[in-house]
Structure formats: C-alpha cells, structure tokens
Regions:
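N-terminal Rossmann/SDR dinucleotide-binding element
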Residues: 1-66, 387, 392-399
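C-terminal substrate-binding subdomain of Rossmann-fold SDR/epimerase-dehydratase oxidoreductases
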Residues: 10-15, 19-27, 191-399
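NAD(P)H-binding glycine-rich loop region in Rossmannoid oxidoreductase-like domains
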Residues: 46-85, 97, 114
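Active-site beta-alpha turn of Rossmann-fold NAD(P)-dependent dehydrogenases/reductases
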Residues: 64-65, 104-108, 163-165, 252, ...
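Active-site segment of SDR-like NAD(P)-dependent oxidoreductases
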Residues: 67-68, 109-117, 165-168
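Short-chain dehydrogenase/reductase
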Residues: 81, 85, 133-145, 175-183, ...
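Conserved Rossmann-fold NAD(P)-dependent oxidoreductase catalytic core, especially the SDR/UDP-sugar
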Residues: 89-134, 160, 173
Length: 399
C-alpha cells in the first residue's frame, strides 16, 4: 500500500472509521474514498456492486457496522445481526469480485465466549457459549472473520481480520441509550456536574448538540429534568445539601480494557502496510497457501489444507490492561470534577465479568499502544467539551 493507493474506508464517519481516515491523512495517504450511509447503502447488494464497479478501490478497510451498548444490543437483536451480516457479506464479496488487493475487516472482542479464560487469546474463539446480551452482534462478527478466512483459502484473497478491544475517542457515540460504557459515563457525569453547579446554559448546550429522546435545550425545564432522571442523572434521594447522583448499571466490579481510537487506527494502518494473511497462518502451511493463491482456483489445491486446519487467523488489538467499571467511573468523576454520588444499580446486568485481550500476537508483529487510560479520559472529555489537546497524541503519531 503506497501513498497514492486508492483506499475505501467503509464507515468513515464513525468512531473507528473517522480515526482511521484521520490517521491515514496524517501519514500522507491522499487518495481516500468515503461514502455516508445516505450516499451508499451497504446493506443493499446492488448499490455496493455499483460502487465497486465505478470506484475500483485497491484497498478496503471495513469499519462500517451497527454498534451499541448492552441495552441496544439486547433490545435490537434482529437489526444487529441482520444489518451487520449484510454489510459484511456485500463489502467482502464485492471486494473479492473486483480484485481488491487487500481488505481489513474490523470486528470486536465480544466474539469471545462469556466464560473464556483471561486474557483472551485468538484461539479461544468458538470454544464455549457467547454472552447472551450481545450474541447477535458477536455472531455477525464471527461470520465476518470466517468469511475472510474462507475467501482467502478458496480464492487466494488477502483479507485480514482484526478484533479491537473497547474503543473510545473523537466522534464517539454519546447517545445515553446506545453508547458504550466510557462515553456514556463521561456524558452522564458531565451532566451531573452541570446540575450540581446549576449551570443550566451548559445543560441546554449539551442537549442542543445531542438531544435525548427528542428533548433538546429548548425544551421545558421540567421535561429536561425528567429525561435526565430517566437515564439516572438526578438529585440524591434524601440529600439535605442538594447533591446529585449518577446511576451506573451493574455492580461496578466487571473489568474492561479500553484503547484510544486513534491508536487503534495506527495499529490498523500498521497491519495494512506490513501484515498479510500468510503472515498469520501456521508457518508450515505458508508455501501451500502461496501455491493455492497463485492458482486462484475456485477449489482448494490437491494438497489443500486437509491435514491441518487453518483458523483463528484474526489479530487482537488492545492494550493488554484492564480496569473495573467502578475504578473507571471514579477516574472520570475526578477528571470532570463531579462532587456527587455514583450509584451502582445492582438490579441491572453486569455483562461479562472480565474482557481482557491477549495482545502477544500483535506485539510479535511489531505494534504496541502508548496512550494510557488516564490520558485518554482527559483527551476525550476535552474533545467532548470542544477543547483541543494535541500534546499526548503527538507521542504516537510521530512514532
């Protein structure tokens, strides 16, 4: 992949895609293609076929997906599995038909079983049942991994799958129903601070920028307070000093790993520039794969891969470090300066108790993270408030 290569980033406006787009630009890649969902419906096969026929991209980064937190995953199960499967099927298949040189498929570490050993190694995939709340999304992402592997083995394509851990960063989703835990906590605690400081202008500004359930900054004050209370941002019951509380689902004991989105983008570009599918298959099968790739037959070569199974070729992308939800919430509280209470609602689900990636494969390939969670929280909160902070980012961009 060179600086003039024609690169299509599917999902270039989201958290993942926008980070990849920005990082590609910073590294001197100029010939980038991006289409919004209004301009290109990736669920529609005919539209995707027409796009590939017209644009003829050389490289594809598949970051488009329907995503969300525990509530959204559980409430919109059919949409999560259908839309993600259709997006993947269309983009991967037409990338093959139109001779894309390389495709990078982005999944999620929710592909691993609920009770998988920690840290999660790539070979733990499909070894036991998934977490129920996000099972449809996870199954779709597993299908994407298998589709890439299968096309590589049968058609000789160069499609690589990566599984990033929980991401956070610029252009994150702060919708209180559909967002992931870290951006949701930042917004809820920020609004809690605004309430305790009686900073009504800041609350109105926040809701005008990101309305909640149709309620914006121009809505009636009572209506605003009601919708905030619905999402657990409300006066502390029985408080004599006007304190406010922020509700957090679960016990706070589960731990999660978090990676700054622009570092994830850096890892993805590193893989696009340096790592091919043949680099993540067993050494003893590389020659067989190369021969089969040269033939580009629609059936496996006579020697094939029957004696040794090729699976789990995906690459985990993460930090290899985790933090409890309780610790995370308190770090965010300290960063924002909220003086109220954090209320952990134990009647709500925790989800998987621990999700920590084993990143030894990624490290062996030559990439490691640099931004730690404390810096990342500050960076994201400053971004959320409209502030810019480049000092921390320069450390890994220059690297």
């Amino acid at each position: 992949m060179n600086k003039n290569s024609k690169i299509y980033i599917a999902g270039h406006k989201g958290l993942v895609g926008s980070a990849i787009w920005k990082t590609l630009k910073s590294k001197g890649y100029e010939n980038l293609i991006g289409k919004t969902s209004e301009n290109l419906d990736l669920i529609d096969a005919a539209s995707v076929k027409n796009f590939f026929a017209t644009e003829q991209p050389e490289y594809v980064i598949l970051a488009a997906a329907r995503v969300g937190g525990i509530s959204a995953n559980n409430n919109y199960r059919a949409q999560f599995i259908y839309e993600n499967l259709m997006i993947q099927n269309n983009v991967i298949h037409y990338a093959y038909l139109y001779d894309v040189k390389k495709l990078l498929f982005l999944g999620s570490t929710c592909i691993y079983p609920r009770e998988t050993p920690q840290p999660m190694k790539e070979e733990f995939l499909l070894t036991s049942p998934l977490e129920y709340t996000n099972e449809p999304y996870a199954i779709a992402k597993i299908a994407g991994i298998k589709q890439c592997e299968s096309y590589n083995l049968q058609y000789g394509t160069n499609f690589v799958s990566v599984m990033p851990t929980n991401l956070y960063g610029p252009n994150d989703n702060f919708d209180l129903e559909k967002s992931h835990v870290l951006p949701a906590l930042i917004r809820k605690i920020h609004l809690g601070k605004c309430l305790e400081e009686k900073n009504w202008k800041a609350i109105q500004y926040d809701l005008n920028k990101r309305p909640i359930d149709g309620v914006d900054g121009n809505s009636d004050k009572k209506e605003i307070l009601t919708v905030l209370e619905k999402y657990g941002i409300a006066p502390t019951p029985g408080s004599m000093h006007g304190q406010y509380s922020v509700e957090i689902w679960g016990t706070g004991t589960p731990s999660r790993e978090f990676l700054w989105s622009e570092e994830m983008a850096d890892a993805c570009i590193f893989i696009m520039e340096n790592i091919d599918f043949e680099d993540v298959i067993p050494k003893e099968l590389k020659d067989v794969f190369k021969k089969n790739k040269q033939k580009k037959s629609q059936k496996l070569s006579a020697n094939g891969f029957s004696k040794t199974e090729i699976r789990n070729t995906h690459i985990n992308i993460g930090t290899g470090k985790d933090i409890s939800i309780s610790q995370l919430a308190n770090k965010i509280k300290a960063t924002i300066g909220f003086k109220g209470n954090l209320y952990f609602n134990k009647s709500k689900p925790d989800g998987t108790l621990q999700k920590l990636t084993d990143v030894s494969k990624l490290h062996a390939l030559g990439w490691q993270h640099q931004i730690e969670i404390d810096d990342g929280i500050r960076l994201l909160y400053n971004w959320y408030c409209g502030l810019k902070e480049e000092a921390v980012l320069e450390r890994f961009i220059q690297h």
